[in-house]
């Protein structure tokens, strides 16, 4: 997910709005910090595009206190938020946006077929309707995202859609830590 760093921030629902085929660093976009939250440290990286290559503009590693993150789950949001703040200061980044991933073990992914003729709004609505068949949690308790992967092999009338879902609490804890 992507979040505006600082007060009044809003989580953007679709990472794909940020990217071209490379993903998170489209030409002319505002800088974006990548934040990795492990059980021992917060790692921060800001890249920029130079032609067809990437350059490291800012980076930092900030240790976390013991048990702030346990088994990839944030236990102490304030401690993680403070570590992120220290890492941003140490790195010297002025970026206003950050992206952080939810641990793979906390994410459900499925490739689902969808009719190719659906426009973006209809596709989003259909994915939300179909998600209940693939997600073992109440749909109101998860954050969903999806990306069209391309045509279904052997059936050009259908597309393959990658559905990703995580319990909302997993996303909200990271969002809270980034907002501090």
Language model features by range: what are they?
Residues 6-8:
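Residue-identity detector for glycine
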Residues 59-89:
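N-terminal phosphate-binding loop and adjacent alpha-helix
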Residues 15-63, 96-103:
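Gly/Thr-rich phosphate-binding beta-strand-loop-beta motif of the actin/hexokinase/Hsp70
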Residues 54, 70-72, 107-111:
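Switch/connector loops and helix/strand junctions flanking conserved nucleotide-binding motifs
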Residues 50-51, 87-91, 134-138, 180:
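Conserved, well-folded catalytic cores of nucleic-acid-processing
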Residues 97, 101-180:
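Active-site neighborhood for divalent-cation/phosphate handling
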């Amino acid at each position: 997910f992507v979040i505006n760093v600082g007060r009044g921030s809003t989580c953007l629902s679709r990472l794909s709005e940020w990217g071209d085929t490379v993903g998170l660093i489209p030409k002319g976009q505002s800088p974006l910090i990548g934040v990795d939250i492990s059980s021992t440290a917060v790692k921060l990286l800001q890249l920029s595009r130079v032609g067809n290559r990437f350059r490291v503009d800012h980076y930092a590693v900030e240790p976390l206190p013991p048990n702030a993150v346990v088994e990839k789950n944030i236990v102490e949001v304030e401690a993680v938020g403070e570590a992120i703040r220290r890492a941003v200061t140490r790195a010297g980044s002025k970026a206003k946006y950050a992206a952080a991933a939810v641990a793979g073990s906390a994410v459900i992914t499925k490739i689902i077929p969808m009719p190719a003729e659906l426009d973006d709004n209809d596709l989003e609505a259909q994915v939300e309707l179909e998600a209940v068949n693939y997600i073992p949690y109440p749909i109101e308790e998860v954050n969903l995202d999806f990306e069209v992967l391309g045509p279904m092999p052997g059936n050009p009338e259908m597309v393959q859609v990658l559905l990703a879902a995580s319990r909302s609490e997993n996303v909200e804890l990271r969002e809270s830590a980034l907002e501090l």
